[in-house]
Amino acid sequence: EQTQLSHLRAIIAEKASGRPIELTLKAEDSSEWTFMRPRDYPGVLADLMSELPWDRPLRAAKIHTAEDGTLVLDTFEFGEPLPFTSNHPQYEAKVERTLAYANENLPDWTDSQIRNYFASCSEDYALTITPFRMANHWQLVQELTGTDGTSVAIEAEDDPNLSRIIVAVSNSTRRSMLQRIATSLSKSGINIHRAYLDSVDDGANGWITLVGCVVQGPDGGSIDENSPLWKEVRGDLLRLKWLDQRTVRLGYSFKELTLPCAEIITALSDLINQYLVKKNPYAFNPTRLDTLVRSNITLAISIASLFQDRFNPRNPLQDSEYNARTAELKELIVNTVDLEDARTVFNVMLDAVDAVKRTNLFIEDRYALSMRIDPSLLTTDDRPECPFGVFFVHGRDFNGFHVRFRDISRGGVRAIHPKGIEQF
């Protein structure tokens, strides 16, 4: 109540001054930040989060928007969450209300499971959540407990123009996950009206972050769970935790570029770097490859789309169509790409697509993008021996190769942590 009163006083003071409401309020110990902004728009949450400090863990977030869109009030709390224990004066009342709800609506949710779930909750979360919402969260948590995965759900709201998106993520930094979700929804033209960030303890496995967003679609209405928009958004949300930061930056830099395409582009760039670096380590270093890709993004998207269509399990490209599209792209490279280095990059990228034999691109719960490739792609004068088989794996902050020189499996992993991107 004291916090709400301070917010009201600040709003009244700004209204009286005649100025737009644009304030940032901080607690004396900086444990709580509140942003007030005069206008709501897709991406406002991501913009505000970029102003938050990185040196303190984000405990909770509460995002609110006025019905007419003329005021945004976002509160962020820092520090480690306090557990909700039986010593709290409201503990028994909260548990009893949840037990009563479960008895009527979710009989499989037992007394012991409910009490164990409360024991894993933070105090802020347990005191503010309704039994209905807690039951939904518990079901999502059950899907994830003991894993490092992600669950995504969409629900209808009482207001027919709104939908609720719930994302549960195991062992992800709360701040980075909320920011990635906010940015992803903004890229899709989805406006966040309200949002909540909480987490529950997952025992020895770590913790599970819960992000709930009450949203409005690009057309100003609710989101149809059977629509192509939701299919794309859901796929992006499931993969957000595992995407490399370069993939995210690339995907959000171009309106026409989807995150799956961006992931393919960064993966292929890292793959061909292993071949091109033997030709010229300066002309084909990772930074320059990224620059050349961005300068020819339409061509890069076309190559990524060829990769997608070739391995689409529902309708894979026939060899004749694949060969025709490859020939068209090679002609496009000759006619439209100016720099010789850039032509080399995109021709080798097409060779890489052709060398891929299998991929896990379309597996929904994958942790990284992997490919089985023709080993001859990586043979050079310095590496004349052609292996029996090669697997390439591209993920968040890593690339990996599994190389077999015979048709026999041997154990062993070598992990190298480079000092910087150029050494990488």
Model-derived regions: residue spans:
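Function-dense linear segments that define catalytic or interfacial modules
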Residues: 399-400, 405
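Non-catalytic interaction/regulatory segments
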Residues: 1-392, 397, 411-422
